[in-house]
Amino acid sequence: IFEALAISDIKAAADLLGDVYHATGGRDGFVSLEVNPHLATDTGGTIEEARKLFGAVNRPNLMIKVPATPAGIPAIKTLISEGINVNVTLIFSRGVYESVREAYISGLENLSNIGGNLSKVSSVASFFVSRVDTAIDGSLEESDQHLIGKSAIANAKAAYADFQRTFSSGRYQTLQNDGARVQRPLWASTSVKNPDFSDVMYVDSLIGLDTVNTMPDVTLDAYKDHGNPNLTLVRDLDDALSHLNMIEKAGVNMDELTDKLLVDGLKAFSDSYDKLIKNISEKRATLLVEQQSSD
């Protein structure tokens, strides 16, 4: 029941955004549908479900959402090599992001080798922002309070520099000449959790070419009211890298923290999925009882 409802809703959403997709030559107007989060440790299961969902929705502006887990990375490569659009989600660290970019590039190369149309494949790499600050700020000692609220933006700016390096390389240029699109960074979780900072801090600081920003209504409304649209993402990269070094010197283990954020993110996805399935099951049972009572 859930799958049928989800596919129906996603088809409608994709059709609604179809004009945007076609008007931008397939650059924008995408809708994402995630695989069952319980498949996050199952490469084969992720690939199988992604193929099924992509075929069932049958819309060119659909992205299949796959988490950036050790099992998800090879699935991403396979899906891209089959021409399936992918939204890689739950990226927190630059190390994982490097694996994500490699999976995308390798997938495009495989698709090119079999004569596939690279211009029809799109992908975004969803880098989660505010949760990084929440995790790191809570780990800082009293003497390091001056570092609060800066780590997520520094992490994202460094990741964007990684993006620029990868997608200006000769390896990628060969693919681009055959019609390939860059895998755009997508900034997710951009609402500010700390009331001591501007409510548009993350949006203002992460504006750059070839990026996407998803935000809740409250953040969007705040940005419309007092946001400052400038190309900020490429500014102060040296300061960002210096901050990340200071975080390490302060005793914060970034890899350990971001690994935990991934685990916590997967649990949140799975819990939401399970709750939805339970609600549908309970509603179905109630309707069946009502139907039997009326017969």
What is the role of each PLM region?
Residues 1-75:
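Active-site beta->alpha loop and helix N-cap motifs at the rims of alpha/beta catalytic domains
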Residues 2-9, 13, 41-45, 89-92, ...:
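Catalytic cores of large soluble enzymes that bind and process phosphate-bearing ligands
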Residues 12, 16-19, 48, 52-55, ...:
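Alpha-helical scaffolding segments of alpha/beta enzyme cores, especially the outer helices
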Residues 26-31, 58-62, 82-84, 119-123, ...:
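Short, well-ordered coil/turn segments that N-cap beta-strands
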Residues 33, 64, 79, 216, ...:
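Conserved, mostly hydrophobic/aromatic
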Residues 85-218:
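Catalytic alpha/beta core domains of metabolic enzymes, predominantly
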Residues 179-285:
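Flexible, acidic glycine-rich loops studded with aromatic residues
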Residues 290-295:
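Acidic, low-complexity intrinsically disordered tails
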